[in-house]
């Protein structure tokens, strides 16, 4: 009979009853009496068990999954003994002595089990079974996970860092591409929201214009202030955005291209958070009415951040911010859109490319003419946006060769490795509708257009008979001449 006293921390001190309780805890209750009580297996004997002991007589467990589950659980016990520092128990490479070791490694166990859920529908109890999977790295988590199994059956699989890498680097399927797109979209959305919150923080600590006048700037000092310039810059940005999203909508590889857009924009704006927060520059123009707001509550800050985020930070939508100068977000977005239009349209569309970059240059000039940013803000924004776009695509187009020759690339470019490995690299710039639209034939050929058969009148019948007689007479004369 198994007791319910607490199990000692050191497995070497376990009695047979403790081994039986431990087997019940990991979901192997059906073998508790057989192993612990019938064959008198205590803690030390448990640590010495191998797969041969379990599958051969006298134990004779016939289920391979149960054998592996017990062996992996014993492996964690061995790890625990080593951590305790008990020199009486040596660490084995695996439960059976010929497999990979978890000692001093980042390997984990992938545990799959059936979890039973209880639902009440129309007053009746309904039980559903869901297949779950968890990665565990310690004994307590393993035991808790195995105990969740509703039917006592679980699958335990050793999963290593190399296995995770292989899963990420497998060729992309459609589902995997869409999943990456959703992750990239969530990443960019959180980055934009964080940027909006930082914009509120820097506005609350903007330097006083009376104490800190605008800094000397070689461009702003020589270009007069144009009040409507910034609104015109945002209008140009909207035009470029419409062009780009039209291209993206009809592009054959729209999922891959959209994923790259979101991942790049999210990364650049995440970098902008730090550059804005580290150093607060004075306002670039005396026309800007900027005052610090040091006493705002957290709720007010979050409300203002959501206002900026939901309106895309555009002054056309009523967003007014100060202190977010290093570096220019408008220049970043416009430059990134111009790069995407150029990269993902055919090379012979030179007219569109020229039009795009001319608008880009005008937009940058209008930002400076509006005195909304210093020249260094615009220059840094253009440089960072261009370099990030080119570096990311250089890696995306050659990721397989680069990563295969230098494993450190996974550490240096984790975002690019995660999103691009398994992808096809450079994509063909071909266009089509996102969905096939089939229009029924009857829409084009109405019943009114179909030929109608009407009864002939008497006069028309007579004319037809006369014409037929003449044709017969001509054919007979033609035959006589030949004869």
Curated annotation (Swiss-Prot):
Its EC number is 2.7.8.-. Residues 397-483 are cytoplasmic. The keyword Nuclease does not apply. It is an enzyme of class 2 (transferase). It is a multi-pass membrane protein. Signal peptide: none annotated. This is Sphingomyelin synthase-related 1. It comes from Caenorhabditis elegans.
